[in-house]
């Protein structure tokens, strides 16, 4: 799945096919790749319908080429499919923190218990593992081996067939020994299709242990079948979250991820390999960046981020025009950094007021002068203190000299920056409260 979509992105961005035809071909490739990854067909066609709708309704910002803009929309919509901005909270909310792992047989639950213990141990927590899976003969030995490998204590009773009794004793002992995080590996004797029995046992164990988190472990290879299991689990345990394992070994990982997200359950981690450290917190945007090929879309995402940051500065300017506060040099600094993210300065310099190059078509020499001025002003801003950026009025002649020395500039250049800043604040107060005036001030709309 990942390779197919990544190849489609590269082909789309570097190919010579006419734009409209290239878009149609890409959408078809995207649909095929997602469906072959076992993503629900309805979800796939809903996704591509949203992409097409945005293409028809929205206009690309001037800092993005049409193809770049299209890929940024694909990135947005795919991120929503896999969970959007939701960031799982993996930090314990109290100590000790009891985690109960549940999952059907073969889901990789015991291996995940070891990985989870290692994840928290690396972060400085004292971790204890409880082996309460009595139905799989090798479960205790496997957990003991993992515990020895990572230096984590394991409690288990190989001759006791009562999982609830073992879990209760193990938790009590680890609480007494002042463990920060206690992970209970519960029984996994039921297969897929036997969710009712699994959830009944989970409830029984939950009532005794009163854990702080219940995590359902799902094998990625079941694809969209994960929907039924995750849905029933989410209804039975609203505080619970999900770990999807074996993402590296199946083409159905996208199907499992999208299915779990569709239930409303939170995906906390994904397993990305067999090694003990191959467990990562799940982040939809990071996952989608990987799908699309981070090297191919990084510059596009950087431009979009710059555009978002620039919009924040524009809103701040609107507030200043309404008499709410004052533009600071920190705002100016943020504005310049945002513009730099949006592409070569030669393409965005005309949007910065007061540089004397706001012509319909600035000459190459004018652009070079402007770029150099921006670079030198940034050096000056980097040499100022936090207080000076917030209130430039405190900068006296002595500080001007120090700032100039620290940034390799002439004192006159620092003075010019401060004069430009003061002029800009005066301009903002004079301009009427209309978006058109702000755009005029900035040489035209960017977004």
UniProtKB/Swiss-Prot annotation:
Name of the protein in question: Signal recognition particle 54 kDa protein
Keywords attached to this entry: Cytoplasm, GTP-binding, Hydrolase, Nucleotide-binding, Ribonucleoprotein, RNA-binding, Signal recognition particle
Domain-related comment: Composed of three domains: the N-terminal N domain, which is responsible for interactions with the ribosome, the central G domain, which binds GTP, and the C-terminal M domain, which binds the RNA and the signal sequence of the RNC.
Organism of derivation: Saccharolobus solfataricus (strain ATCC 35092 / DSM 1617 / JCM 11322 / P2)
A GO term from the CC aspect: signal recognition particle
Record: residues binding GTP: 103-110, 185-189, 245-248
GO MF: 7S RNA binding; ATP hydrolysis activity; GTP binding; GTPase activity
Main location: cytoplasm
Biological processes per GO annotation: SRP-dependent cotranslational protein targeting to membrane
Subunit record text: Part of the signal recognition particle protein translocation system, which is composed of SRP and FtsY. Archaeal SRP consists of a 7S RNA molecule of 300 nucleotides and two protein subunits: SRP54 and SRP19.
InterPro entries (alphabetical): AAA+_ATPase, P-loop_NTPase, Signal_recog_part_SRP54_M_sf, Signal_recog_particl_SRP54_hlx, Signal_recog_particle_SRP54_M, SRP/SRP_N, SRP54, SRP54_GTPase_dom
Enzyme Commission code(s) on record: 3.6.5.4
Its job: Involved in targeting and insertion of nascent membrane proteins into the cytoplasmic membrane. Binds to the hydrophobic signal sequence of the ribosome-nascent chain (RNC) as it emerges from the ribosomes. The SRP-RNC complex is then targeted to the cytoplasmic membrane where it interacts with the SRP receptor FtsY.
Catalytic activity annotation: GTP + H2O = GDP + phosphate + H(+)
Record gene name: srp54
PANTHER family noted in UniProt: SIGNAL RECOGNITION PARTICLE 54K PROTEIN SRP54, SIGNAL RECOGNITION PARTICLE SUBUNIT SRP54
Annotated localization: Cytoplasm
Pfam families: SRP54, SRP54_N, SRP_SPB
Family assignment from sequence similarity: Belongs to the GTP-binding SRP family. SRP54 subfamily.
């Amino acid at each position: 799945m990942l390779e197919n979509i990544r190849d489609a992105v590269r082909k789309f961005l570097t190919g010579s096919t006419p734009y409209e035809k290239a878009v149609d071909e890409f959408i078809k490739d995207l649909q095929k790749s997602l469906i072959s990854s076992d993503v629900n067909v309805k979800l796939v066609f809903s996704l591509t319908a949203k992409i097409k709708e945005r293409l028809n309704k929205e206009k690309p910002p001037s800092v993005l080429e049409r193809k770049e803009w299209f890929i940024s929309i694909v990135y947005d919509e795919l991120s929503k499919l896999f969970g959007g901005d939701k960031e799982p909270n993996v930090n314990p909310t109290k100590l000790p923190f009891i985690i109960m792992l549940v999952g059907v047989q073969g889901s990789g639950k015991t291996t995940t218990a070891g990985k989870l213990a290692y994840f928290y141990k690396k972060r400085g927590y004292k971790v204890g593992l409880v082996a309460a899976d009595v139905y799989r003969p090798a479960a205790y030995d496997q957990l003991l081996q993992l515990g020895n490998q990572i230096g984590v204590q394991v409690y288990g009773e190989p001759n006791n067939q009562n999982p609830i009794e073992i879990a209760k004793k193990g938790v009590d002992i680890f609480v007494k020994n002042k463990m920060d995080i206690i992970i209970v590996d519960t029984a996994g004797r039921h297969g897929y299709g036997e969710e009712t029995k699994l959830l009944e046992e989970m409830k029984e164990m939950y009532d005794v242990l009163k854990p702080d988190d219940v995590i359902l472990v799902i094998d990625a290879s079941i694809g969209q079948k994960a929907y039924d299991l995750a849905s029933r689990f989410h209804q039975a345990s609203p505080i619970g979250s999900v770990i999807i394992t074996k993402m590296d070994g199946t083409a159905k990982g996208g199907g499992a991820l999208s299915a779990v997200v569709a239930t409303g359950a939170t995906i906390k981690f994904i397993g990305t390999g067999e090694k003990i450290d191959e467990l990562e917190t799940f982040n939809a945007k990071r996952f989608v960046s990987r799908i699309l090929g981070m090297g191919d879309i990084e510059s596009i995402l950087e431009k979009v981020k710059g555009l978002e940051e620039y919009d924040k500065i524009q809103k701040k300017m609107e507030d200043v025009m309404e008499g709410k506060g004052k533009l600071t040099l920190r705002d100016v600094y943020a504005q310049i950094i945002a513009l730099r993210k949006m592409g070569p300065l030669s393409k965005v310099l005309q949007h910065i007021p007061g540089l004397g190059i706001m012509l319909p078509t600035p000459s190459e020499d004018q652009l070079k002068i402007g770029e150099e001025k921006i670079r030198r002003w940034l050096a000056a801003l980097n040499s100022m203190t936090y207080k000076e950026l917030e209130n430039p009025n405190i900068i006296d002649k002595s500080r001007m000299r120090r700032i100039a020395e620290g940034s390799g500039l002439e004192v006159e250049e620092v003075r010019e920056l401060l004069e430009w800043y003061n002029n800009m604040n005066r301009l903002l107060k004079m301009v009427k409260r209309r978006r058109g005036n702000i755009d005029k001030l900035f040489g035209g709309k960017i977004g």
